[in-house]
Each structure stands twice: as C-alpha cells, then as structure tokens.
Amino acid sequence: MKQKGFSRKSSLLKEIDFYLVTDSGLSMKGTLSDVRDAVESGCRIVQYREKDKSTKEMVEEASEIKRICSGRAIFLVNDRIDVALAVDADGVHIGQDDMPVETARKLLGEDKIIGLSVNDREEAVLAEKLGADYVGLGPIFDTATKKDAGEGIGPLKIREVKDAIKLPVVAIGGINKENCESVIQNGADSLVAISAVVCSNDVKREAKYFIDMIRRTRKA
C-alpha cells in the first residue's frame, strides 16, 4: 500500500543526501542533461529552478524532468507552484518573499513536499510551525550564484538550527569540495553545491563525489 501524507514525505526526505538545484545560466550541458546525469549518479532530490524561460517552456522542461526523476528522485519546482501543479511534481521550494507556506499547502495538498528557505534559527522554527517539510538553510558561505543571498552565516549555524527543529536541514550557499565536509559534520542532512556541479563537464562524476562524501562523513 502506498503511504500518503506526512509519513510518506518523511520517509522520502530521510533518504536524501546530495540535492541538485538546476541553473541553466551556469550549466555546461543544459538542464536536462544535468538532471539525467545527477540522477544516474544516485542523486535522490532535484529542484528545477528556472528564471528566464516562459511558462510554456518551463512546463515542457519540467515534464521531462519529472519523467527522468520518476521512481528515482524527489522532484521539486522552485517558486512556481503553477508549474508544479501542471506537471504534478512532488512539491515546491519557496523563499521568504514568495507565496506563504499556508497558501502553498492549500493549493498543493498535504501529500506534496514544501521546502522553505531560511537564514537563521528563528526563521527555521517558524517554518516548522507553518508546516514546511524541510528547510533550506543559507547561505552557509559567501556565494556568487544567488546575488541577493547575503553574507555567509558559517557552518556552525547549521547545528544551531538542527538542534531547534525536527525538520531535515538542507545547507546551501557557497558549498564546494573544500568546505563540504564541515557542512555535514555540523549536522546538515543534505547539501546543495550548484556551481561545483553544473559548471562541470562531468556532472555525474561531481554529483557522485558529493554523494560519497556525505555518506562517508555521516558514518565517521
């Protein structure tokens, strides 16, 4: 019997490690190629983030991403709840200035996953109260990928947030091969490393590096 609601979402989110966020502006081979390679490497969660294409183009691309992820990875859409609904994605990731979590939940239903970007402990605690399923905490380090992200908060803040909530914590912002272990050591359940992966000619290799690092560091 297929699980529904909270128990199903919780079990899915417990399985994530490396979290792919797409970026067509940085990608060397294109969004679909990046998703395909990351999923084949073992990535179990993908967020489709696209700021420059029309809604029609996004729906078409999101439909293909859903097909690639089907049965292998959680598929979320960044911000665009209309696109997520159109392709029946597994959920959305929204920011502090986007649609409120409560409104998104009414539109998507209880079975869908909603992630919320947070910058500190207070925002994370509120996210949990509002019904988010996980938080994206950052920027952990200074990053050029998201120009309005602000200064890095540092990996020690991960533990502070992790100790305050029961939700999975996904670390994002300026994460690369040199600093990624500190992110997991400080309690992050998953991490995003956009430029370190999609700027590569071998996305599969780079995604696998982070997957292996996360699993190895968890066991240490």
From Swiss-Prot:
Keywords (alphabetical) are: Magnesium, Metal-binding, Thiamine biosynthesis, Transferase
Q: Which Pfam families match?
A: TMP-TENI
Q: Which residues bind 4-amino-2-methyl-5-(diphosphooxymethyl)pyrimidine?
A: Q47, Y48, R49, E50, K51, N78, S117, K146
User: What family does this belong to?
Assistant: Belongs to the thiamine-phosphate synthase family.
Q: Name one GO molecular function term.
A: thiamine-phosphate diphosphorylase activity
Q: Which residues bind 2-[(2R,5Z)-2-carboxy-4-methylthiazol-5(2H)-ylidene]ethyl phosphate?
A: T143, A144, T145, G174, I194, S195
Q: Which SUPFAM superfamilies match?
A: Thiamin phosphate synthase
Q: Which InterPro entries match?
A: Aldolase_TIM, ThiamineP_synth_sf, ThiamineP_synth_TenI, TMP_synthase
- UniProt-listed Enzyme Commission number(s): 2.5.1.3
- Give the species: Methanosarcina barkeri (strain Fusaro / DSM 804)
Catalytic reactions on record? 2-[(2R,5Z)-2-carboxy-4-methylthiazol-5(2H)-ylidene]ethyl phosphate + 4-amino-2-methyl-5-(diphosphooxymethyl)pyrimidine + 2 H(+) = thiamine phosphate + CO2 + diphosphate; 2-(2-carboxy-4-methylthiazol-5-yl)ethyl phosphate + 4-amino-2-methyl-5-(diphosphooxymethyl)pyrimidine + 2 H(+) = thiamine phosphate + CO2 + diphosphate; 4-methyl-5-(2-phosphooxyethyl)-thiazole + 4-amino-2-methyl-5-(diphosphooxymethyl)pyrimidine + H(+) = thiamine phosphate + diphosphate
Residues binding Mg(2+), per UniProt: D79, D98
Tell me the function of this protein: Condenses 4-methyl-5-(beta-hydroxyethyl)thiazole monophosphate (THZ-P) and 2-methyl-4-amino-5-hydroxymethyl pyrimidine pyrophosphate (HMP-PP) to form thiamine monophosphate (TMP).
Cofactor(s) the record lists: Mg(2+)
Co-factor remark: Binds 1 Mg(2+) ion per subunit.
GO biological process: what's one of them?
Answer: thiamine diphosphate biosynthetic process
- Organism's domain of life? Archaea
Pathway info: Cofactor biosynthesis; thiamine diphosphate biosynthesis; thiamine phosphate from 4-amino-2-methyl-5-diphosphomethylpyrimidine and 4-methyl-5-(2-phosphoethyl)-thiazole: step 1/1
The record's NCBIfam families line, in alphabetical order, gives: thiE (TIGR00693)
Q: What is this protein called?
A: Thiamine-phosphate synthase
> GO CC annotations?
cytoplasm
